Amino acid sequence: MLLEGRKLLITGVLTDRSIAYFVARRAQEEGAEVILTGFGRGLRITKRMAKRLHTEADVLELDVNDPAQLEAVAGTLDERWGSLDGILHAIAFVPADGMGGQFLQTPSASAVAAFETSAFSLKALAAALLPLLERGESASIVGLDFDASVAWPAYDWAGVSKAALESINRYLARDLGPRGVRSNLVAAGPLQTVAASNIEGFEGLAQVWERQAPLGWDLSDPTPVADACLFLLSPLARAITGEILHVDGGVHALGAAVPDGAASEAAAGDEARTAS
């Protein structure tokens, strides 16, 4: 199996439709041992989701912005496993005044809060668990991303934070590679998750993907994204670090929208030329 015997810490499981939940479930199917983390009021929800996995997973409390809790999680994992083979970073938060077309009005405190939780936390988690990762086998950190190469409507400081996340990923790759630890991101297309429901303008983004993705895009299926995460968490990706793997049906590769009917007209033209 792809992840046989690997020990993984997975953050961000809040519903059984979340990408993180699908990663945890698929990881167990591929032979991994999994521990989840939860925080605040969401901790109880994460514990409920842990019971729905193939094998119930333990849940550790973790506020990723609290150094004491990071240290406590590291201690628990050290006692339990003694090493760590992989981490899924599925953590993001943006205050309400940092999204929804309020980019110019967002106060610095909200921008900083978005950066700290959505981006800096990747570094914080990696640094806190590095001694365990160094003892792991081809250890891998995977973070969930949304393409930050362009400005999306209403995404605002979430987009800025994702851009920071992508930069942090590159610096982690630089600094952790010599210590045998990889760091990569998976830039997913939009999915109907709890996180997406909090994004004003999500329906517009969803329509872009449904209309333009060359491979098509199923808003209700996190499995392709989860499987990409499993690949990066596995030894098969042992020579890959600092990468952003787009799992979005190909939308990131398009320079402009394809007009409705253009693809079918082009195909019809090719057929006519072939016939002649």
Where are these regions (language model features)?
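Catalytic loop of short-chain dehydrogenase/reductase
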Residues: 12-21, 92-130, 134-178, 190-193, ...
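Short-chain dehydrogenase/reductase
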Residues: 74, 122, 126, 169-170, ...
